[in-house]
Amino acid sequence: QKDGGSIYYINLSQDEFKLGGSSFAQTLNKIGNDVPTIKDSNFFKKAFNTVQELIKDSQIVAGHDIGSGGLITTLLEMCFADVNLGAKIDFSVFEEKDIIKYLFAENIGIVFQAKDNATIEAKLNANGVSFYKLGNATTEATLDFGPCKLDIVKYRDIWFKTSFLLDQKQ
């Protein structure tokens, strides 16, 4: 949301960014052997329950799971929700420096926008839930991450067209 707080990412898998089994790997006609998995089921449960509490307390104003297409697709789809909505993202928070891995890995995770950053961070920290603060929503229809600025209108049109064509085949 344009007037919301910061954008956060929680890697529910607690695994490294892996491309095996991803849509990205499929575009290269590969499946891959190294697929992400949930490394710590206790963390998963703790993080899930904490996020549910934050939703119940109206502290999360928008959210999306990481699924097909990875983090880049999630961020784009979150920006598709409104006109003149974009995001400025800083991926330097990740230890992983391979941009392909963190953009396209399909590790189970969530991205959400906070109502109040301090409340969100206090709750996550108190419950031992690790998170990454990625950036903020903007009123410019671009997904801006360092050297790349993606035009939301252009990618929304591609997404709708692709979804329409896929629906016709199903």
Task: Label every PLM stretch briefly.
Residues N33-P36, F48, Q52-Q170:
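Glycine-/charge-enriched secondary-structure boundary and capping motifs
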